[in-house]
């Protein structure tokens, strides 16, 4: 199983705030230098590398003399805008000492939910990687709002793994990996060395929240692994305080928790659909429609929908749930919520008489639908 790590040719490495700062007192340049040494060694071993770096808010807080992470959005954005300058300068300086170039890329969810911008970001990232440059990626905290934020850099790293079709996502954290119980409360807790990313039993052991400086707890890391699995990537959740951890991973040492995709890589468009985090409404399906989606790879027809919830326009993302309320799929609606209300439960042949026109016979076409 660890051959999936040692043989991986393209890595996305996510480093959290706690591993880049000196107890919240600004950037730890010494720690960053050690990370860079290991990443340069990976590059020289032929590994293509993308870095997703937290730390902008923490660096800005230190510069402003703040000791506690603010909750107000405008204060967070102010800290991020100050800290991002210092963060990128630190990475550029450290990589430059080894003759390596870096590039800053700031992303928002809007960048990846728009198909044209998504493809442009993918093209830019792949070009940088092909040139041997190390892209340093962060969320654009200065302009993002609660409604369109990724929520944490674990999720962003997973979507970047999809963008560049990475073989491996490495999420470095302040824990040694995922445990079968909370090691802070249970001394008998055992590290989970390998599992399938979609294993439902992992949800029960992934509770908890992030640290004081960061946003992502173990649950977000598990969700990130599942997102990355959509593009066929393996994910390692591993302790960033383990000495020379990246070197040791590359050497095949059995460290951290390796989460593997069960299914093969989704097609590129399906990866883009799976990466949509913001949904506008919900379609409640009957059992027959659920079966048609899951077993026959069919489009979603109006006749199979029982209820429409929320407000959405044509082309916006909706969640499809079964009679039990569990999510089955998500996709882009061919009709608005108001139009969908009028045609659900009806044959596609009746759409024109009900609406006065017929855009498509499907409520969600299978090409715009991804199973979850």
From Swiss-Prot:
Function noted in UniProt: Catalyzes the transfer of a phosphate group to glutamate to form L-glutamate 5-phosphate.
Name it: Glutamate 5-kinase
| Species of the source | Pseudomonas putida (strain W619)
- Please give the GO cellular component terms listed in this UniProt entry: cytosol
**InterPro entries this protein is in?**
AceGlu_kinase-like_sf, Asp/Glu/Uridylate_kinase, G5K_ProB, Glu/AcGlu_kinase, Glu_5kinase, Glu_5kinase/COase_Synthase, Glutamate_5-kinase_CS, PUA
The entry's family comment says: Belongs to the glutamate 5-kinase family.
Write one Pfam family the protein is assigned to: AA_kinase
Binding, ATP = 14, 173-174
Residue intervals of the PUA domain: 280-358
Q: Which UniProt keywords apply?
A: Amino-acid biosynthesis, ATP-binding, Cytoplasm, Kinase, Nucleotide-binding, Proline biosynthesis, Transferase
Localisation per UniProt entry: Cytoplasm
Q: GO MF terms on file?
A: ATP binding; glutamate 5-kinase activity; RNA binding
Q: Please tell me whether the keyword Kinase is annotated for this protein.
A: yes
Q: Identify the residues that bind substrate.
A: 54, 141, 153
> Which EC number(s) does the record attach to this protein?
2.7.2.11
Its pathway, per UniProt, is: Amino-acid biosynthesis; L-proline biosynthesis; L-glutamate 5-semialdehyde from L-glutamate: step 1/2
Question: What does the record list as GO biological process?
Answer: L-proline biosynthetic process
Quickly give the catalysed reaction.
L-glutamate + ATP = L-glutamyl 5-phosphate + ADP
By its UniProt entry, which SUPFAM superfamilies does this protein fall under?
Carbamate kinase-like (SSF53633), PUA domain-like (SSF88697)
Class of this enzyme: transferase
């Amino acid at each position: 199983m660890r051959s999936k790590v040692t043989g991986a040719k393209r890595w996305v490495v996510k480093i959290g705030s706690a591993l880049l700062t000196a107890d919240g007192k600004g950037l730890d340049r010494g720690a960053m230098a050690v990370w860079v040494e290991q990443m340069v060694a990976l590059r020289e071993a032929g590994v293509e590398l993308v870095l997703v770096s937290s730390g902008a808010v923490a660096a800005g807080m230190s510069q402003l003399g703040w000791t506690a992470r603010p909750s107000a959005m405008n204060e967070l954005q102010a800290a991020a805008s100050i800290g991002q300058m210092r963060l990128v300068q630190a990475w550029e300086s450290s990589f430059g000492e080894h003759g390596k170039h870096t590039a800053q890329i700031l992303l928002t969810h809007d960048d990846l939910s728009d198909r044209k911008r998504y493809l442009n970001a993918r093209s830019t990232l792949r070009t940088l990687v092909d040139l041997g440059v190390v892209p340093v990626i962060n969320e654009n905290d200065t302009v993002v709002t609660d409604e369109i934020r990724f929520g944490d850099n674990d999720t962003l790293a997973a979507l970047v793994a999809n963008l560049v079709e990475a073989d491996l996502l490495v999420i470095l954290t302040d824990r040694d990996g995922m445990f079968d119980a909370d090691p802070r409360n249970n001394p008998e807790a055992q590290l989970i060395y390998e599992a399938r990313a979609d294993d439902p039993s992992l949800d029960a052991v992934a509770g908890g929240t992030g640290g004081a400086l960061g946003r992502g707890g173990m649950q977000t890391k598990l969700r990130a692994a599942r997102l990355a699995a959509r593009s066929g990537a393996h994910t390692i959740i591993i302790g960033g305080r383990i000495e020379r951890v990246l070197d040791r991973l590359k050497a095949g040492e059995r460290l951290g928790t390796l989460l593997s995709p069960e299914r093969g890589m989704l097609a590129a468009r399906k990866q883009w659909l799976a990466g949509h985090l913001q949904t506008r409404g919900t379609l409640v399906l009957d059992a027959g429609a659920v079966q048609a989606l899951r077993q026959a790879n069919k489009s979603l027809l109006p006749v199979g929908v029982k209820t429409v919830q929320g407000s959405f326009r044509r082309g916006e993302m909706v969640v499809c749930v079964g009679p039990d309320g569990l999510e089955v799929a998500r996709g882009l609606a061919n009709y608005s919520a108001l139009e969908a209300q009028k045609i659900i439960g009806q044959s596609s042949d009746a759409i024109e008489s009900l609406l006065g026109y017929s855009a498509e016979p499907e409520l969600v076409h299978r090409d715009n639908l991804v199973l979850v």
